[in-house]
């Protein structure tokens, strides 16, 4: 079954963006390529149980098994050695990507405490959007009474466009609730 946001993109969003951005070819229209979910846990090397719980929770949130991330080099000030586990990440593409985006926009973001919209300044100058969530408990897949540690999640939305304005319009069409200037 095709995810709701994917069919909405193909039937409504893509033709609308093609007209509004003035593209001749449908292939020039901005498209979401992948979503990368990353968790960096400072206590991963001192508390292996917290890291294992993080792997399970990110797997529940995304529907895919996360990959552990390791330190590339030693940093004495942070007591980090090369090869230590520092966190985990998941790359979502295809159906999983659209299903995650749908759940994130319509279920998880409204559960954020004092939510006024996501920051529109999270674009990197290359058409990709980055945002951070302070708590993993905003996702409905996480059972609040079973978590030991609360940690933040970094989410990167990668698009095929190089222009931030085009990516902004794409995410707005998906329903991303951006913070307005007055708030």
Curated annotation (Swiss-Prot):
> Subunit comment for this entry?
Part of the 50S ribosomal subunit; part of the 5S rRNA/L5/L18/L25 subcomplex. Contacts the 5S rRNA and the P site tRNA. Forms a bridge to the 30S subunit in the 70S ribosome.
Protein task: This is one of the proteins that bind and probably mediate the attachment of the 5S RNA into the large ribosomal subunit, where it forms part of the central protuberance. In the 70S ribosome it contacts protein S13 of the 30S subunit (bridge B1b), connecting the 2 subunits; this bridge is implicated in subunit movement. Contacts the P site tRNA; the 5S rRNA and some of its associated proteins might help stabilize positioning of ribosome-bound tRNAs.
Its transmembrane ranges are none
> What gene is behind this protein?
rplE
Q: Which InterPro entries match?
A: Ribosomal_uL5, Ribosomal_uL5_bac-type, Ribosomal_uL5_C, Ribosomal_uL5_CS, Ribosomal_uL5_dom_sf, Ribosomal_uL5_N
| Family stated for the protein in its record | Belongs to the universal ribosomal protein uL5 family.
- Under what name is this protein listed? Large ribosomal subunit protein uL5
Q: Which UniProt keywords apply?
A: Ribonucleoprotein, Ribosomal protein, RNA-binding, rRNA-binding, tRNA-binding
Cited Gene3D superfamilies: 3.30.1440.10
**Molecular function terms, GO-annotated:** rRNA binding; structural constituent of ribosome; tRNA binding
The record lists the lineage as: Bacteria, Pseudomonadati, Spirochaetota, Spirochaetia, Leptospirales
**GO biological-process terms attached to the record:** translation
Q: Does the keyword RNA-binding apply?
A: yes
One GO cellular component, as annotated: ribosome
């Amino acid at each position: 079954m095709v995810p709701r946001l994917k069919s909405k993109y193909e039937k409504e969003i893509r033709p609308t963006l093609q007209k509004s951005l003035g593209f001749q070819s449908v292939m020039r229209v901005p498209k979401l390529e992948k979503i990368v979910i990353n968790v960096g846990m400072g206590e991963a090397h001192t508390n292996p149980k917290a890291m294992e719980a993080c792997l399970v929770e990110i797997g529940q949130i995304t529907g895919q098994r996360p990959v552990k991330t390791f330190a590339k080099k030693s940093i004495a000030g942070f007591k980090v050695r090369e090869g230590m586990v520092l966190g985990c990440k998941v790359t979502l593409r295809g159906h999983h990507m659209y299903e995650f985006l749908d759940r994130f926009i319509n279920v998880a973001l409204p559960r954020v405490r004092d939510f006024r919209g996501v920051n529109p300044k999270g674009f990197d100058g290359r058409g990709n959007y980055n945002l951070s969530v302070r708590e993993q408990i905003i996702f409905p897949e996480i059972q609040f009474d079973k978590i030991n540690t609360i940690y933040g999640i970094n989410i990167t939305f990668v698009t095929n466009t190089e222009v931030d304005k085009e990516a902004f319009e794409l995410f707005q069409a998906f329903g991303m609730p951006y913070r307005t200037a007055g708030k």
